[in-house]
Amino acid sequence: MNCEDMVKIPELENVLLLRAGAGGMKNIVRWIYFADCLQCVQSEYKVEDYIHGGEFVILTNRSVTDNKDTLIGLIGKMLAHGISALGINEGQISDELIQYADGNDLPLFELPEKYPLIDLFQILCNKL
């Protein structure tokens, strides 16, 4: 499945709002990775231990998303290891992040803050 296919899933019609990175909508999504754990941004852990390529990465932890430099640095490392797309809660997407995603053809999806992520995971995993 690619990013274009994800947005065509009827149950996700009002869930995945593309905010940037339209040039990467053909990126293949192999799996979903929920990257809110703080350990994935601490220096003793390596992104490559968690990212293997083709992931749709979900980040909703404000302690990560509110720090623009940390967030863009983390996304850059994940991009180097082949992530396919990024999902971040509404209200947590900065203009800098939109520019970064557009510049890297990384589909950036805004997620409704109140939408149960378990539902998103189940729907997408059943399609994968």
Label each residue range with its predicted role:
Residues 1-128:
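Alpha-helical/coil-rich non-catalytic "connector" segments in signaling and regulatory proteins
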